[in-house]
Amino acid sequence: MQIRRAKPGDVDDVVSLVESAYRGESSRVGWTTEADLLDGQRTDPDEVVSVLDDLIVAEDDSGLVGCCTLIPRDGHAYFGMFAVRPGLQGGGVGSQLLAEAERLAAEHGAGHVEMTVISTRTELIDFYLRRGYVDTGETRPFPYGDDRFGRPRRDDLAFTVLVKQL
């Protein structure tokens, strides 16, 4: 597996990868599905293009197998758009990609990595806690009414903020 910065030619494949990992029936193959929480899209080409400079992809001979964004902020990096091809989840791709993102963040001077996870996704939060992230106790509101993030099937969604010191 090779991990690299995304290129403009990756946009459509990234959209397909993210959608397959989080939305619809195909996402149920993996454990990151949000199909019971949200309908609609998870991302679109415009969003991917807007973060292209901060997008990291993992690929093997079959194509893209994972992606994430690592967005520089004041003294830290924000980790997001994390997706692994559903059939490969649980096989180490995500752990390798996360470790590389953390390495890059430290290399570029970030003191910590921050991310947000839907609060009801306890298995996902546990994944990050096992990798050294800490629940800050802070929550952020879910963007209800903004279909770019999907159409909620519940009215109790919020984000938990996780941080890992580098």
Kindly give the residue locations of the regions a language model identified.
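A short beta-loop-alpha structural element at the N-terminal edge
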Residues: 2-16
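Conserved GNAT-fold acetyl-CoA-binding loop/helix
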Residues: 19-47
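A short helix-loop-beta-strand connector motif used in the catalytic cores of GNAT acetyltransferases and
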Residues: 42-57, 78, 155-158
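Conserved beta-strand in the GNAT
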Residues: 57, 63-71, 76-83
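A short, internal acetyl-CoA/4′-phosphopantetheine-binding micro-motif in the GNAT/acyltransferase core
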Residues: 82-89, 117-119
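Conserved acetyl-CoA-binding loop-helix of GNAT-fold acetyltransferases
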Residues: 84, 90-103, 130
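C-terminal "cap" of GNAT-fold acetyltransferases
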Residues: 111-125, 131-166
